[in-house]
Amino acid sequence: MKFFIDTADVKEIRQAHDLGLVDGVTTNPSLIAKSGRKFEDVIKEITEIVDGPISAEVVSLEAAGMIREAGELAKIHKNIVIKLPMTPEGLKACAALTREGIKTNVTLIFTPMQALLAAKAGATYVSPFVGRLDDISQDGMGIIDDIKTIFDNYGYQSEIIVASVRNPVHVLNAALIGADIATIPYSVMLQLAKHPLTDSGIERFLKDWESVPK
């Protein structure tokens, strides 16, 4: 299973990369805005840190505009993946970019059928949002299971990125279902490494070591 980090905070990306956990990065306009920096500057710096897929999102709502933006983004670095919204115009742009050999990530997916449409349009990645579904009392992980079944049934090559991850349980369930990727906030990555028995075990080892004659 691959781990992407879901942030535009370059410091967090460096820290996660140093842990050996980052296979790629997902960003969006909201995350870029939080950085307070120019969009292109942030993306360029990220590509210097992580040698893997870097999702950068278009802001146009019409396919023609998305395709124009995608062309500019793709020039930044070979690892740029164009993030497109799950709309009819987004699907149109996805199909066109796929024909041009540009990788795409169709985002804001909330149903298995949306994921199926994105796969049929040739999306490199599909990004279902589990946390936001949980927020409205729907089964976020359930749609991941359904998408995985559909893709396996028909041999779609689009990779499933479990997005809107809120806690370690989301990551665990994504792994158990067999999702290709989870895109995870840095804070949740750190939680994955923690357990109170690990902490108490380290404390006990250190205490025992202090009693060893020196």
Curated annotation (Swiss-Prot):
Domain of life: Bacteria
Keyword Metal-binding: no
SUPFAM superfamilies, per the entry: Aldolase
A GO molecular-function descriptor: aldehyde-lyase activity
Reactions this protein catalyses: D-sedoheptulose 7-phosphate + D-glyceraldehyde 3-phosphate = D-erythrose 4-phosphate + beta-D-fructose 6-phosphate
Family membership noted in the UniProt record: Belongs to the transaldolase family. Type 3B subfamily.
Function summary: Transaldolase is important for the balance of metabolites in the pentose-phosphate pathway.
Official protein name in the record: Probable transaldolase
The species this protein was found in: Geobacter sulfurreducens (strain ATCC 51573 / DSM 12127 / PCA)
Gene: tal
